[in-house]
Swiss-Prot record:
The gene is hisA. It is an enzyme of class 5 (isomerase). The active site is at 10 (proton acceptor), 131 (proton donor). This is 1-(5-phosphoribosyl)-5-[(5-phosphoribosylamino)methylideneamino] imidazole-4-carboxamide isomerase. Its main location: cytoplasm. It comes from Bifidobacterium longum subsp. infantis (strain ATCC 15697 / DSM 20088 / JCM 1222 / NCTC 11817 / S12). Its EC number is 5.3.1.16. Keywords: Amino-acid biosynthesis, Cytoplasm, Histidine biosynthesis, Isomerase. It catalyses: 1-(5-phospho-beta-D-ribosyl)-5-[(5-phospho-beta-D-ribosylamino)methylideneamino]imidazole-4-carboxamide = 5-[(5-phospho-1-deoxy-D-ribulos-1-ylimino)methylamino]-1-(5-phospho-beta-D-ribosyl)imidazole-4-carboxamide. InterPro entries: Aldolase_TIM, His_biosynth, HisA/PriA_Actinobacteria, Isoase_HisA-like, Isoase_HisA-like_bact, RibuloseP-bd_barrel. HAMAP family: HisA (MF_01014).
Length: 241
């Protein structure tokens, strides 16, 4: 079974950046978000994971940059939009901009009734981001605790969530390897598909994630590993096939 790869473009203050463990102020600047996204599309990406960090942290938004990327590249690549989608207005804006899928994080923890209603309305165009420390969820740009992972999943499964994007916060941006045990635990407890995020540092990490494909881990987000040139996207795509 093949693995779908989603190169990440995280946008802060109009620039493409990478954070360490999701901490505000830890970013490394990688220049134009549009150029970053175009680089991954030209290298063969079928999906881009596009994140508005300012919206996630509540420090503004980068809607103009995100809209440009979707407008210019949306006919060549599927875009998963994430960051600050917490209500009808922000969700509608993301979908109207042309996102193929929208990733809901904090709202799923703070407003479960709303999350249930949009899952029912939009189906597989809505994924839920589960950002985890141990078995505890992190919320609002990872600055607060949001409850037990498996209790939250039980509720989301009951309302028909079709995909979880699972990030071990301790691993993200650290190039220390993914939390395979966490991914296995999540995938074994749900019929929803699972996207792995955080910690991928070498091609063997992708091979390890690919072994979980048969239990529902069908995709992986690539961030720091690509920007730090640990491997090329072409090399990663060859492993993921």
């Amino acid at each position: 079974m093949s693995l779908t790869l989603l190169p990440a473009v995280d946008v802060r203050d109009g620039k493409a950046v990478r954070l360490r463990q999701g901490e505000s102020g830890s970013e490394t600047d990688y220049g134009s978000p549009f150029e970053a996204a175009r680089t991954w599309v030209e290298a063969g990406a079928e999906w881009i994971h596009l994140v508005d960090l300012d919206a996630a942290f509540g420090t503004g938004n980068n809607r103009d940059q995100l809209r440009e990327i979707v407008h210019e590249l949306g006919d060549r690549v599927n875009i998963e939009l994430s960051g600050g989608v917490r209500d009808d207005a922000s969700l509608d804006a993301a979908l109207e901009a042309g996102a193929a899928r929208v990733n809901i994080g904090t709202a799923a923890l703070e407003n479960p009734d709303w999350t249930a209603s949009v899952i029912k309305k939009y189906g597989d165009r809505v994924a839920v981001g589960l950002d985890v420390r141990g078995h505890t969820l992190a919320a609002r740009g990872w600055t607060r605790e949001g409850g037990d992972l498996f209790e939250t999943m039980k509720f989301l499964d009951s309302v028909g969530c079709s995909r979880y994007v699972v990030t071990d916060v301790a691993k993200d941006g650290m190039m220390s390897g993914p939390n395979i045990q966490l991914l296995r635990e999540v995938a074994e407890r749900t019929d929803a598909k699972v996207t792995a995020s955080g910690g991928i540092s070498k091609l063997d990490d992708l091979r390890a994630i690919k072994e979980l494909a048969e239990i529902g881990v069908d995709s992986a987000i690539l961030g720091k590993s690509l920007y730090a040139r640990a491997f090329t996207l072409q090399e990663a795509l060859a492993v993921a096939k």
